[in-house]
A protein has these predicted regions:
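Periplasmic OmpA-like peptidoglycan-binding domain that tethers envelope proteins to the cell wall
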Residues: 265, 290-361
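Beta-strand/loop-rich accessory regions of lumenal/periplasmic or secreted enzymes
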Residues: 93-150
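Periplasmic peptidoglycan-binding/tethering modules of Gram-negative envelope proteins
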Residues: 216, 220-287, 322, 361
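Acidic, serine/threonine-rich low-complexity disordered tracts
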Residues: 21-67, 72-97, 135-248
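Extracytoplasmic/secreted envelope proteins and their assembly/folding machinery
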Residues: 194, 269, 273-276, 302, ...
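Extracytoplasmic
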Residues: 175, 204, 252, 284, ...
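Bacterial N-terminal signal peptides
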Residues: 5-15
Length: 361
């Protein structure tokens, strides 16, 4: 192999590595984490307020002054049994981000905005450091602020990391995660527990949390599982226009819907503005918004839901952002065009999407 060939091969390998390298995830206002959540407590009974089956939790960082302020979607029942939907604010102070011993996994409409001694999207820096450096740590969590604290010991499964796929700004990236398991205890109940942690220097993130049934062992079918499936944050460049120009098809990242509904969540507003701005300057002619679902539910239900979600995006773009209605068509494809397997929680979440395609091709 000549020196020129060697140099060329090295350059190609470096370029390929750069394409798959995980981008730095900022901890700043405007960053949005989308978490797929699955509850299956059919064998033990569903606690009040907990949605059964798949749902999504959308958490935006809104402020990083003196800690981290979150704005999270809520869909469920309040303490009085009334069904509620809205935004829940949660503040984690800088001190708690550093040293808190309890992680609150969920965001409930009845919860106070700040709870001393607790973290939110991930364990504290101190808990994470103990796990990474010593291989073991004491860990506690609550599902919501008002729920009981469940505690135990987490042990790192190996000295290395495992790869965990996440869509970051629409691009599939494999993040390096620290894996830990343990048996956590509440009273006489013991539950197997697993967590995968992104060891972020500013804010460790629980990429996956799962626990099994009472007195269950490993491996286990989760009663509860939560996985980060998307991370969206503002970037430079017009990715929508670039995607249309290249492939005449682009997935609209940053559009989030209420559980089993076509109601667009408030955290979608920044994405809607970006889409409208891109389309107003795009040379493309007529465009079609296409809705897609997972395979949970009947074919008819999924067809109707996907069509209603595409219509909802069109309505928002026309009503709130001044796009011409005749330029936008809509279609619903239900579960028929998956991009990933429907056999996993993350795969089903990624199949629930809206795409924009050129209608004249």
């Amino acid at each position: 192999m000549t020196p020129f060939t060697t140099a060329l091969l090295f350059a190609v390998l470096v370029a390929q590595a750069a394409q798959t390298q995980a981008p730095e995830i900022p901890i700043a206002p405007g960053v949005i984490f989308v978490l797929a959540v699955s509850n299956d407590t059919s064998s033990t009974g569903a606690p009040a307020g907990i949605l059964q089956g798949d749902s999504e939790l959308v958490v935006a960082i809104t402020d990083t002054t003196g800690g981290i302020t979150h704005a999270a979607s809520f869909e469920g029942r309040d303490a009085s049994g009334v069904e509620r939907r809205g935004i829940v604010r949660r503040v984690v102070s800088a001190a708690d981000l550093a040293t808190a011993r309890v992680q609150i996994l969920g965001f409930h409409v009845d919860d106070p905005a700040a709870v001393a001694g607790t973290s939110a999207l991930g364990p504290s820096l101190a808990v994470t450091r103990e796990l990474v450096q010593e291989g073991v740590t004491a860990y506690s969590f609550r599902n919501w602020v008002s729920r009981e604290t469940i505690s135990g010991t987490l042990k790192r499964t190996s000295s290395g990391t495992v790869k965990f796929p996440v869509l970051i700004n629409g691009r599939r990236v494999e993040l390096e995660a620290v894996q830990a398991t343990g048996v956590l205890v509440l009273g006489n109940a013991r539950r197997p527990f697993e967590m995968l942690i992104l060891d972020h220097p500013r804010y460790p993130i629980s990429l996956r949390v799962a626990y099994g049934p009472r007195d269950g062992g490993f491996p286990f079918k989760p009663d509860f599982a939560r996985e980060v499936v998307r991370i969206d944050f503002p970037t430079t460049g017009n990715t929508i226009a670039e995607g249309l120009a290249k492939d005449c098809r682009v997935e609209l990242r940053g559009i989030y819907f209420d559980f089993n509904e076509a109601t667009i969540k408030p955290q979608s507003e920044a994405a809607l503005k970006e889409i409208a701005s891109a389309l107003k300057t795009s040379p493309q002619g007529r465009l079609r918004l296409e809705g897609h679902t997972d395979n949970i539910g009947s074919d008819r239900y999924n067809d109707e839901l996907s069509a209603r979600r595409a219509e909802a995006v069109k309505a928002a773009l026309v009503r709130d952002h001044g796009l011409d209605a005749p330029r936008l068509m809509t279609a619903g494809h239900g579960e028929r065009r998956p991009v990933e397997t429907n056999d996993t929680l993350a795969g089903r979440a990624r199949n629930r999407r809206v795409e924009l395609v050129c209608a004249d091709r």
